[in-house]
């Protein structure tokens, strides 16, 4: 049995998760503590890196103590941290702390990929992950991935050529005067609207477009132009039409990728995976295509330390070597690089 403590500080959530890796490879969540600084960013309409970094400094100690207490652990066997991608200053806070704990406790340190953590979060709810296609959708990332196992190299099938899906949500939420963060509020508003009242364009869906690539910049512009030309537009209908366009493209391409590759499982992960319409449409299309759909509960979709602990546990189980304590953070770490060693 191996106990893994993991720190997540890539953006505005300070997360500490603790997981247990059993001899049979099973991963069990022991603690998941998160402190968010989102309220400090609201008046700026987005995350301010300096504020996020200072908030991590203040929150990490108390969050660590709560996690250790909840798990009943005094000293883990492994310490892990998000090494990238993310905000440079925010990453430094978590990685520096993790390295210090690793050295003080005399245990191995694993520098792991934040995006891989999103994929690994689902294991807590649905068990070991089979070979699958993964749709990873978050505030700054939109990727289609081929995942053979969480301990094997990840293959990128496609990604966004401009805005990520989560970025589009935040930008359209601002256009509608919904404030920041906009994803959840826009989702709630869209549920009260008519998603067929306004049909917005679906980017990168033409016969000559890359089948697994995404584009949401044009959709955002289309919403802005619609609002300019329709000053009396019903915001709920605009939100519903926008959300339908995003969910349609994401699920259509994800199901196609799984079908093309002959895999039977589709995993959807990342913050946008908490979106109600995306989950609903994915369920419908996976059922029609004979695919098994896996989506973590909403609390596991957003940033947290538990997902980093899970991913680190799978790397340990696969025999990956620890990372050196002088390994640098990598704010632009690509999704296909699971670990920095």
Curated annotation (Swiss-Prot):
It is found in: Cytoplasm. One of its GO terms (biological process) is tRNA threonylcarbamoyladenosine modification. InterPro entries: ATPase_NBD, Gcp-like_dom, KAE1/TsaD, Peptidase_M22_CS, TsaD. Keywords: Acyltransferase, Cytoplasm, Iron, Metal-binding, Transferase, tRNA processing. GO terms for molecular function: iron ion binding; N(6)-L-threonylcarbamoyladenine synthase activity. It catalyses: L-threonylcarbamoyladenylate + adenosine(37) in tRNA = N(6)-L-threonylcarbamoyladenosine(37) in tRNA + AMP + H(+). Fe cation binds at residues 114, 118, 303. Its main location: cytoplasm. Its cofactor is Fe(2+). It is an enzyme of class 2 (transferase). It holds the Pfam family TsaD. SUPFAM superfamilies: Actin-like ATPase domain. GO terms for cellular component: cytoplasm. Required for the formation of a threonylcarbamoyl group on adenosine at position 37 (t(6)A37) in tRNAs that read codons beginning with adenine. Is involved in the transfer of the threonylcarbamoyl moiety of threonylcarbamoyl-AMP (TC-AMP) to the N6 group of A37, together with TsaE and TsaB. TsaD likely plays a direct catalytic role in this reaction. Belongs to the KAE1 / TsaD family. This is tRNA N6-adenosine threonylcarbamoyltransferase. It comes from Mycolicibacterium paratuberculosis (strain ATCC BAA-968 / K-10) (Mycobacterium paratuberculosis). The lineage of its organism: Bacteria, Bacillati, Actinomycetota, Actinomycetes, Mycobacteriales. The gene is tsaD.
């Amino acid at each position: 049995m191996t106990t893994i403590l993991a720190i997540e500080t890539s953006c505005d959530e300070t997360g500490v998760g603790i997981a247990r890796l059993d001899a049979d490879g099973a991963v069990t969540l022991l603690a998941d503590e998160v402190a968010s600084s989102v309220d400090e960013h609201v008046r700026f309409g987005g995350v301010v890196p300096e504020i996020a970094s200072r908030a991590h400094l203040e929150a990490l100690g108390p969050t660590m103590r709560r996690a250790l207490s909840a798990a009943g652990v005094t000293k883990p066997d492994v310490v892990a941290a998000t090494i990238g991608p993310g905000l440079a200053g925010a990453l430094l806070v978590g990685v520096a702390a993790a390295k210090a704990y690793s050295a003080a406790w005399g245990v191995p340190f694993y520098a792991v990929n934040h995006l891989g953590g999103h994929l690994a979060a689902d294991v807590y709810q649905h068990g070991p992950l089979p070979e699958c296609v993964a749709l990873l959708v978050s505030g700054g990332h939109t990727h289609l991935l081929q995942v053979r196992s969480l301990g094997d190299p990840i293959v990128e099938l496609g990604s966004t050529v401009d805005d990520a899906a989560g970025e589009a949500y935040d930008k359209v939420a601002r256009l509608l005067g919904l404030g920041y963060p906009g994803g959840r509020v826009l989702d709630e508003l869209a549920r009260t609207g008519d998603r067929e009242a306004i049909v917005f364009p679906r980017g990168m869906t033409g016969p000559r477009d890359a089948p697994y690539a995404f584009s949401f910049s044009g959709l955002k512009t289309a919403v802005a132009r619609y609002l300019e030309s329709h000053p009396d537009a019903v915001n709920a209908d605009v939100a519903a039409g926008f959300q339908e366009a995003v969910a349609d493209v994401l699920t259509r391409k994800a199901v196609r990728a799984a079908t093309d590759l002959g895999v039977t499982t589709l995993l959807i992960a990342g913050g946008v995976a908490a979106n109600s319409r995306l989950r609903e449409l994915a369920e419908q299309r996976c059922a029609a295509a004979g695919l098994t759909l896996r989506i973590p509960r909403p609390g596991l979709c957003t940033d947290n330390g538990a997902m980093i602990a899970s991913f680190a546990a799978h790397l340990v189980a696969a025999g990956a070597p620890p990372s050196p304590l002088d390994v640098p953070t990598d704010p632009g770490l690509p999704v296909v690089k699971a670990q920095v060693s």
